[in-house]
Swiss-Prot record:
Alphabetized GO MF terms: argininosuccinate synthase activity; ATP binding
Name of the protein: Argininosuccinate synthase
Species whose genome carries this gene: Deinococcus geothermalis (strain DSM 11300 / CIP 105573 / AG-3a)
Name of encoding gene: argG
Catalytic reaction equation(s): L-citrulline + L-aspartate + ATP = 2-(N(omega)-L-arginino)succinate + AMP + diphosphate + H(+)
Enzyme nomenclature, EC number: 6.3.4.5
Family according to the record: Belongs to the argininosuccinate synthase family. Type 1 subfamily.
Lineage top rank: taxon: Bacteria
Length: 414
């Protein structure tokens, strides 16, 4: 519980969305924990009205309320560095929720320092990954910070208790029926979890999706788009140079109208359970495939394979909340060094949910047409291949001889 000294309450900074749950948390922190509450609402491109949330926080009792436009910082300093790593969690998930949490938590800590707050708080439940991501970041940046997680601490037994508390404290409770799933959105994706989606056999309803049209309803003609990269990052799409946030938004628009970027998976949470998530990541999907196409021309084979070997670990670190851990930062140094060579253009063909690479070019391409040609010439002498093969097969030939000798000895004993 917050302390009261000489009439002054301790301050706490709350990650506030403006929704019912975080409004209840705001009031609960005031009434049950005796904090002065400062709220922080991040604009990550989710489409919500952040200024409206700021005003609502003040009306609900916050002593101060921050609303910050973090779209460019989010894409430039978090999404794009992660893209350079070709990170996919468990082979599918482009980490749209995971990568947003360290930035939100970082701003919570910065505001706490500015306001002289002793604690930070969030609305993540005690069963999910977000509680870990928020709090790991907070501790990494400010080791002595106090974290308060109401969903782990309060005595409410269910939604009915929460709504009763809200009404008792003048917090409006929506009367319209809530969607039977939860969502989280930012410029990179929208996620859908819980409710009817907890049955892994149940197909998501068509009306659930917001960023993408159904592949069946996508245009009957393919759309082609070119994506340009410089030193590892996308800088232009469709011939238009854009800022990081604007480029990702444009990629979302292009991919979304072609039904690209839907995935449905069961993933392994860091806290130990499996959960089903449905994601829309149209722009991220386009940029992932485009980048891999340019990398295929510009990266040395062993460098590419080494980077790809590190990618699952990098993705795991992001997913589990270790963005500010030294091992993730060390990996980033190598990944950024590799990415310096990734300059070029990829051409994509989008058609009814499919994203296919149909062209790639690069000014410093390692692809040598003369070398791979079936015609004679170039620096490659086909006669050398025989010796190359024999040398690489040497250990297997030795193993085969040893195995054959052992088999003969076993037969002789019989």
């Amino acid at each position: 519980m917050a302390n009261v000294q000489q009439g002054q309450k301790d301050k706490i900074v709350l990650a506030y969305s403006g929704g019912l749950d975080t409004s209840i948390i705001l009031k609960w922190l005031q009434t049950e924990r005796n904090y002065d509450v400062v709220t922080f609402t991040a604009d990550l491109g989710q489409g919500d009205e952040v200024e409206e949330a700021r005003v609502k926080a003040l009306n609900t009792g916050a002593v101060a309320a921050y609303a910050l436009d973090l779209r460019e910082e989010f894409v430039r300093d978090y999404v794009f560095p992660m893209f350079r790593a070709a990170a996919l969690y468990e082979g599918y998930y482009l980490l749209g929720t995971s990568i947003a949490r360290p930035l939100i938590a970082k701003k919570l800590v910065e505001i706490a320092e500015k306001e002289g707050a002793v604690a930070v708080s969030h609305g993540a439940t005690g069963k999910g990954n977000d509680q870990v991501r928020f709090e790991m970041t907070a501790y990494a940046l400010k080791p002595d910070i106090v974290t308060v997680a109401p969903w782990r601490d309060w005595d409410f037994q269910g939604r009915a208790d929460l709504e009763t508390f809200a009404r008792e404290h003048g917090i409006p409770v929506p009367t319209t029926k809530k969607d039977p799933w939860s969502t989280d959105a930012n410029l990179l994706h929208i996620s859908y979890e819980g409710g009817i989606l907890e049955d892994p056999w149940a197909e998501p309803p068509a009306h659930m999706f917001k960023l993408t049209v159904s592949p069946e309803e996508a245009p009957d003609q393919p759309e082609y788009v070119e994506v340009e990269f410089e030193n590892g990052d996308p800088v232009a799409i469709g011939g238009e140079r854009l800022s990081p946030a604007a480029l990702l938004a444009k990629a979302n628009e292009i991919g979304g109208r072609n039904g690209v970027g839907r995935i449905d998976l069961v993933e392994n949470r860091f806290v130990g359970m499996k959960s089903r998530g449905v994601y829309e990541t149209p722009g991220g999907t386009l940029l992932y495939h485009a980048r891999r196409a340019v990398e295929s021309l510009t990266l040395d084979r062993e460098v590419l394979h080494q980077r790809d070997a590190l990618a699952p670990k990098y993705a795991e670190l992001v997913y589990n909340g270790f963005w500010f851990a030294p091992e993730r930062e060390a990996l980033q140094v190598y990944i950024d060094h590799v990415a310096r060579s990734v300059t070029g253009t990829a051409r994509l063909k989008l058609y009814k949910g499919n994203c296919t690479v149909v062209g790639r070019r690069a000014p410093r391409s390692l692809y040598d047409k003369d070398l791979v040609s079936f015609e004679a010439g170039g620096d490659y002498n086909q006669h050398d291949a025989g010796a190359f093969i024999k040398l690489n097969a040497l250990r297997m030939r030795v193993q085969a001889r040893v195995d054959a000798k052992r088999t003969q000895q076993e037969v002789a004993r019989v």
